[in-house]
Amino acid sequence: MTVSTQTRRLVLPPPYSQHRIAQGDATAEAAARAPAEGAGTLIWRWTAGGPKSGPGRLDLAVVLEPDLALPGARLGYVAGMAALCEALAAHCPPERDIRIRWPDELRFDTNRLGGARLVLAPGSAEGAVPEWMVFGAELIADRDNIAVPGEYPHSISLTEEGFDDPPAIIESFAAHLMLLFDRWKHEGAEAVARAFAGRLEGGGAIGDAGDLMREGGREALGPALARAPRWRDATGPLL
């Protein structure tokens, strides 16, 4: 049964507080609310696609309040990506492959499904604890705007892959994120790093600051996320 985009409401555990938006940038909305509403504020958007509106979207953004200086705090982004991968995997057949193309693109069986971003509080410095951060993700919910089959062979959507209730992914994400933060607390940063590294396209390991380590060298997460993402443009995920 396909759930209506108009009536769906998330079922989230504490400490999350949800706000649904009909349009606009969920990540920007979360950043605007972060100073006043704080950690656990979750903004989401679920819209249907069409010839005039473009592809359907499933977007989420959650406010985090780290207690580590920025290099360590960026592991919150690593946890967010790993949690999103686990949420997607929980709602698709086990033979389907969910991968992260470093540092920010989500791939579903080699096709682009969307990606993620990290927004920092203004004035955040490398040696200081950020006042807040926002982990935001955007997924292609449907591609009903495509008039010619096969026109965009490098992307895929949730609807095409049988996700009948896309917001359930956000509910699973929220639970997996809490679980990963708990593992981080009790098992150390390595638990979060392993969860992300296990989904990396092309393999590799993740360091304590979220940096990518491969045979060819090390790439810092901060500068990688600061670059313009290749998976989206100003309007959202690329098809």
Locate predicted features:
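Histidine (H) residue identity feature
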Residues: 19, 91, 145, 154, ...
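RNase H-like, two-metal
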Residues: 142-144, 161-171, 217-225, 229-238
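Structural motif
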Residues: 108, 214-215
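N-terminal lobe of the biotin/lipoate ligase/transferase fold
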Residues: 1-93, 195, 221-239
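Conserved, helical-rich catalytic subdomain that frames metal- and/or nucleotide-binding sites
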Residues: 161-212, 233
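Nucleotide and nucleotide-moiety/phosphate-recognizing core
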Residues: 45-155, 163
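Surface-exposed, charge/polar-rich loops and edge strands
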Residues: 158
